[in-house]
């Protein structure tokens, strides 16, 4: 059953088109299995019967899909009570690790200035088999404005006051809105690492086209440039090409492991 706003400190938004009902149920089950009570908002096409059934079964509120992922997440947060202390979103195939919310809420409670708590993320294939663990640790925030984004989004938790202070997600981004958010939040307060795996990200071999990857990298570079001082922006050419190459290599390696696992 859902927690009431007075009971729940955590709001989690799940955005879905309803095309992967079996994964959506796993996502919702991983949230409901947490020790820390949370309320769930699903943003999806309202006519989708599988989404309606899942919302009823897992006690989630249902809101209409506004047409883009960042807009869906902003809607889920904006249309919810302001009493929640912490907020995040999950895609319809992400999973929270058992104890995830206990770790991240404890980290934010212990660090009142912190805006985000995050941990490591397990990459899994469509069958749930482990491909990779992304574990950058406490130095990930230090390279955020020039290096790769190594803070896994699915298991992180954002302090709601900080989310509202920076205005939520920038809907001009199609892919890099999470990086843009983290860069803004880092200016408000620290991003703290809990030191454990807190989520799983499901890797689909066909989830991003070559064009999507190029757009993602271009958006990431735009977000980073926006976060830098005018002087620092003049030197982005020093690191953008190496980071671009490293990003392509990492994606190819995960893709290779996914194909090997499936084969």
Predicted features and spans:
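Short, acidic, metal-binding catalytic loop of nucleotide-sugar glycosyltransferases
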Residues: 26-38
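Catalytic core of nucleotide-sugar-dependent glycosyltransferases
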Residues: 141-145, 201-204, 210-235
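Glycine-rich, basic loop-to-helix element that forms the pyrophosphate-binding segment
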Residues: 64-82
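A short, conserved alpha-helix in the catalytic core of glycosyltransferases
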Residues: 162-167, 172-203
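A conserved acidic beta->alpha catalytic loop
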Residues: 44-52, 91
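Short aromatic/hydrophobic "clamp" motif used to bind/position activated sugar donors
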Residues: 87
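Conserved donor NDP-sugar-binding/catalytic core segment of glycosyltransferases
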Residues: 95, 99-131
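A recurrent flexible, glycine/aromatic-enriched loop bordering the glycosyltransferase active site
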Residues: 128-129, 138-158
């Amino acid at each position: 059953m859902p927690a009431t706003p007075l009971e729940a400190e955590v709001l989690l938004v799940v955005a879905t088109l309803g095309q992967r009902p079996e994964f959506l149920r796993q996502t919702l089950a991983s949230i409901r299995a947490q020790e820390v009570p949370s309320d769930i908002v699903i943003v999806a096409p309202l006519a989708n019967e599988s989404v309606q059934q899942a919302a009823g079964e897992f006690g989630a509120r249902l809101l209409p899909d506004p047409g883009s992922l960042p807009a869906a997440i902003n809607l889920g947060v904006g249309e919810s009570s302001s009493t929640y202390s912490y907020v995040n979103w999950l895609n319809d195939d992400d999973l929270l690790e058992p104890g995830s919310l206990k770790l991240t809420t404890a980290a934010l409670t212990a660090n009142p200035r912190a805006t985000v708590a995050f941990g490591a993320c397990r990459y899994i294939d469509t069958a749930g088999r482990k491909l990779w663990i992304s574990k950058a640790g406490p130095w990930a925030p230090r390279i955020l404005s020039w290096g790769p984004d190594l803070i896994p989004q699915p298991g992180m938790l954002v302090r709601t006051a900080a989310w509202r202070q920076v205005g939520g997600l920038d809907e001009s981004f199609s892919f890099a809105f999470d990086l843009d958010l983290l860069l803004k939040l880092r200016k408000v307060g620290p991003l703290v690492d809990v030191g454990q795996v807190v989520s799983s990200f499901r890797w689909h071999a066909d989830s991003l086209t070559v064009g999507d990857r190029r757009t993602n990298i271009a958006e990431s570079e735009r977000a980073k440039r926006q976060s830098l001082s005018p002087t620092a922006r003049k030197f982005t050419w020093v690191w953008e090409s190496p980071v671009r190459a490293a990003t392509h290599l990492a994606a190819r390696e995960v893709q290779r492991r996914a194909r090997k696992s499936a084969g």
